[in-house]
Regions:
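Mid-domain catalytic core of redox enzymes
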Residues: 2, 11, 96, 246-343
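Glycine-rich active-site loop/strand segments that organize a redox cofactor
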Residues: 49-72, 140, 145-148
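N-terminal Rossmann-like FAD-binding beta1-loop-alpha1 element of flavoenzymes
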Residues: 13-40
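Conserved Rossmann-like nucleotide-cofactor binding loop
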Residues: 23, 46, 281
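Mobile amphipathic helical/loop "lid" adjacent to a hydrophobic cofactor/ligand pocket
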Residues: 77-78, 82-201
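Glycine-rich FAD pyrophosphate-binding loop
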Residues: 32-57
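Short loop/edge segments at beta-strand edges and connector loops
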Residues: 19, 94, 244-246
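Helical element adjacent to the flavin cofactor pocket in flavoenzyme catalytic cores
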Residues: 201-265, 269
């Protein structure tokens, strides 16, 4: 939510950014670059949102709050890492490579060939062992259709990606063992639960546009030292006021204009412009009741989450060679070899 109606006669208007996750960090850096005085307000004692690490009390080992990855097509995130000077603390595959196993231990490999997009996918699809030849032909036909479909058509927001796939001849096996293999880690849900527009976006931008779009990247050290801590140092060095431990309790609105935010401590923080990078529920709860009922904001309360269960296991010996792998026909979706990943 941005109040766009306030101007300042003395230089750029001051901006309060609500939320210190990745979106809030990026917004604060961008606006500070434009010369705006910035105050960044974050509920927790650190920046990074859900991209953080903590020390396990029993082992003393630094543990990430779940495994976070990005793709080569996430150009804005890559730019952010470079701007913070921490890109070298992350790893990005030189080419897309994904090992896929089933319950029986049969392994398949999806990898980008040294061919121009989208033909770089062809060898991997033709040799992928987890779907039959009939499915492979139908998958290739659907990928061609996906590449040339305008994902911004309104009706594609009204149907699920699963429905779009079924309309284009995809079987349950192909959806579970190939399409969802990409959709679940990208959109944090299955094809049945995401719009056709979003599903098409993932395949168009992540797989079909360029040969390196699907290259997988991840932090090579703990998440907090890889982004949250350097982000705070960067922002403070740039003159941004970083207010940690300040949960936003209420957003004050007068005559359809935001005039301040009240922190849980009771302090009122004011600026001339306001940007919300809060989670949907957090934003909705902070709004005055009359504003909560407005059509634009009422939908925030109806948004549902799709939680991820992360299990951290310590072994007394190496148990896998790959940095990570994916699974089909299993409630287990991905396994990451943290000993290999953490440099």
């Amino acid at each position: 939510m941005v109040d766009q109606h306030v101007t300042s006669s003395a230089g750029k208007p001051s901006v309060v950014v609500l939320g210190g996750g990745i979106a809030g960090i990026a917004a604060a850096i961008f606006l500070r670059d434009q010369g705006y005085p910035i105050t960044l307000v974050e509920a927790r004692r650190f920046l990074g949102g859900r991209v953080f690490s903590f020390t396990d009390e029993e082992t003393g080992v630094s543990v990430d709050n779940g495994q976070h990855v990005f793709l080569g097509c996430c150009t804005y995130f890559i730019q952010l890492l470079k701007r913070l000077g921490v890109f070298q603390q992350w790893y990005l595959q030189p080419r897309w490579r994904l090992k896929v196993l089933d319950r029986a231990g049969k392994a398949g490999l999806l990898a980008a060939a040294p061919l121009p997009a989208p033909f770089h996918l062809l060898p991997a699809l033709l040799t992928y062992p987890h779907v039959g030849w009939g499915d492979k032909v139908r998958v290739l036909a659907a990928l061609v259709r996906a590449r040339f479909t305008d994902r911004h058509q309104p009706h594609l927001e009204e149907i699920s990606f699963y429905q779009w796939l079924k309309q284009h001849g995809q079987t349950e096996a192909a959806i579970a063992k190939l399409w969802d293999l990409v959709i679940v880690p990208s959109l944090n849900d299955h094809a049945r639960e995401v719009s056709a527009s979003m599903g098409l976006m993932i395949f168009q931008e992540g797989l079909l546009r360029a040969r390196h779009s699907a290259d997988v990247g991840y932090a090579a050290e703990g998440l907090s030292p890889a982004i949250g801590e350097p982000a705070r140092r960067h922002l403070e060095a740039a003159g941004v006021q970083v207010r940690l431990g300040s949960p936003v309790q209420r957003i004050l609105i007068d005559e359809e204009r935001v005039i301040g935010v009240v922190a849980a401590s009771g302090e009122t923080i004011t600026g001339q412009l306001y940007v919300s990078a809060l989670p949907p529920q957090g934003l909705w709860q902070a709004l005055p009741e009359p504003v909560q009922g407005l059509p634009f904001f009422a939908g925030l309360q109806r948004l549902e989450t799709s939680p991820i269960v992360n299990v951290h296991l310590w072994y007394d010996r190496p148990v896998m060679e790959d940095d990570f792998c994916a699974f089909v026909d299993s409630p287990l979706q991905w396994v990451f070899n943290k000993s290999a990943i953490m440099r």
